[in-house]
Amino acid sequence: RTAYNGSEALETLDGTVDIVLLDRRMPVMSGNEVLAAIEERGVDVRVAMVTAVDPDFDIIDLGVDDYVVKPVSKDTLVGVVERLETVAEYNDRQKRLTAKKLKRNVLEVEKSRPELEASERFSELQAEIKALETEVQALETEITESRIER
């Protein structure tokens, strides 16, 4: 979807949107205002600021996942979107990993070592945690390397 000003962007924003590209200087509403509205709504999207405004220390508190200074090539923009997709995947996997680790921790506190060792489901949980840890590490490496290439 494409919106030509901040107000249109907010009108079209719903749960099916995964990534938002904003400019700090947009008609009707600034990118910062749109970003504040997105945060207020609690919409789970990755946001990149693509703008001619050079970054300053204020970006530290800006709720964006990436900040790109124009002019931007199509290849760079595609790379930004791909990186944000990877960040979303990373966040999802990290959330799943944390939930599984919390369950494991509860079981380790509440069950005896022999009970844990005898449980096939607990062994499966351990394997799931190990696999997710590997996936999270690989995604983290991918994000870092794509950042360096830019």
Describe each PLM feature range.
Residues G15-L21:
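Active-site beta3 strand of CheY-like receiver
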Residues V53-D66:
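Alpha4 helix (beta4-alpha4-beta5 surface) of REC/receiver domains from two-component response regulators
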Residues P27-V28, R41:
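The feature encodes the CheY-like receiver
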Residues Y90-R150:
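C-terminal output/effector regions of signal-responsive regulators
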Residues T2-E11, G31-E33:
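Helix N-cap/capping motif at the beta->alpha junctions
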Residues K70, K74:
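A Lys-centered signature of the CheY-like receiver
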Residues L77-N91:
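Receiver (REC) domain switch/output surface
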Residues L22-R24, S30, T51:
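Active-site residues of response regulator receiver
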